[in-house]
From Swiss-Prot:
GO terms for biological process: phenylalanyl-tRNA aminoacylation. Its EC number is 6.1.1.20. It is found in: Cytoplasm. One of its GO terms (cellular component) is cytoplasm. This is Phenylalanine--tRNA ligase alpha subunit. It comes from Bradyrhizobium sp. (strain BTAi1 / ATCC BAA-1182).
């Protein structure tokens, strides 16, 4: 028994002294492996008398249990120490700016950045975001928006139509995000305050037009909404988006089937050697269209125009992105040129706020 106690003490000391998992495994094999010291003692039980086997067997198994428990406890300690050392070696400060690397790094596309900027600005004014399908019905895209039969936008050369259904109805790629406004008015009761960003499609392609582009439209429906509210919202948006403290705006009469009166908005700017500066100068630049929602549109969406009125506006996201960040050709936004994106794109984590731009 004294030999067993000495062996147990020796093994436990070796376990405590093991400095890593490899050394601990060597101790385990030497003690509990097929040819281990404790395993050898267990093999001698068959040669003992029943009384000896009962006494010695209990003692050897007790020693084996103590060694097994000590191995498990030491293994947990070593694993925890190894993890702590690894974490200490791999610690990084995630608040530090990204380091320049010869390897290519991904960039945030200017359209994604601008989408974040404008949704954040309007969210601060209390607007929610509404979305809808790219493939729309003629009814939602045109009829409920007061487009009369024979309107040029309903012709094949302006709109991507699908083949007619057996009943003669046609599906199409939406030409604006206004159908989202229709869907919102049909499913929500006033007051309504939403913006509708998304992809739109028209048959057009040149330096300032592409068959697929992005729009954001806004809609407010309430009992007391008026053009003064619309003017304030657009004025505050332009100041925040173009990062100026003051900007003059000019509202010009226009015509859209879904608004009455209809207006187009110009903003003050100065052109200097190919650069556009907003909030100063004597030039004017058209930026969006807007107006009071036509009573026919309200009726088509189940809203009583004698009780409620509202206003709406729409602008091209691609266009305002080009104006803010100095891009000259709209088509480059969709070409997937990595060199172009490395110049105009944004490095992750380098834009301090969603509403921030180049000046930040």
């Amino acid at each position: 028994m004294s030999d067993l106690a000495s062996l147990e003490t020796s093994i436990l000391d070796q376990i405590a002294a093991a400095g890593d998992e490899a050394a601990l495994e060597a101790v385990r094999v030497a003690a509990l492996g097929k040819k281990g010291s404790i395993s050898a003692l267990l093999a001698t039980l068959g040669k003992m008398s029943p009384d000896e086997r009962k006494t010695q067997g209990a003692a050897i198994n007790l020693a084996k249990d103590k060694v097994t428990q000590a191995l498990a406890a030491r293994r947990d300690v070593l694993k925890a120490a190894a993890l702590d050392a690894r974490l200490a070696a791999e610690t990084i400060d995630v608040t530090l700016p990204l380091q320049d690397s010869p390897a290519e790094t991904g960039r945030i596309h200017p359209l994604s950045q601008v989408m974040d900027e404008l949704t954040t600005i309007f969210a601060d004014m209390g607007f929610s975001i509404a979305e809808g399908p790219d493939v729309e019905t003629d009814d939602y895209n045109f009829t409920k928006l007061n487009f009369p039969e024979g309107h040029p936008a309903r012709e094949m050369h302006d709109t991507f139509f699908f083949n007619p259904k057996p009943d003669g109805s046609r599906m199409l790629l939406r030409t604006h995000t206004s159908p989202v406004q229709v869907r919102t008015m049909l499913t929500q009761k006033p007051p309504i305050r939403v913006i509708c960003p998304g992809r739109t499609y028209r048959i057009d392609s040149d330096a300032t037009h592409t068959p697929q582009f992005h729009q954001v439209e806004g809609l407010v429906i309430d009992k007391g909404s008026h053009l003064g509210h619309l003017k304030w919202i657009l004025h505050e948006f332009c100041k925040a988006f173009f990062e100026v403290d003051h900007i003059n705006m000019k509202f010009r009469p226009s015509f859209f089937p879904f608004t009455e009166p209809s207006l187009e908005v110009d903003i003050q700017c100065r052109r200097d050697k190919g650069e556009i500066r907003f909030g100063e100068g004597e030039d004017w630049l058209e930026i969006l269209g807007c107006g009071m929602v036509h009573p026919n549109v309200l009726r088509a969406c189940g809203i009583d125009p004698d009780e409620y009125q509202g206003f709406a506006w729409g602008m091209g996201i691609d266009r305002i992105a080009m104006l803010k960040y100095g891009m000259s050709d709209l088509r480059q936004l969709f070409e997937g040129d990595v060199r172009w994106l490395s110049h105009y794109g944004f490095k992750p984590l380098e834009v301090p706020t969603l509403a921030g731009g180049l000046s930040t």
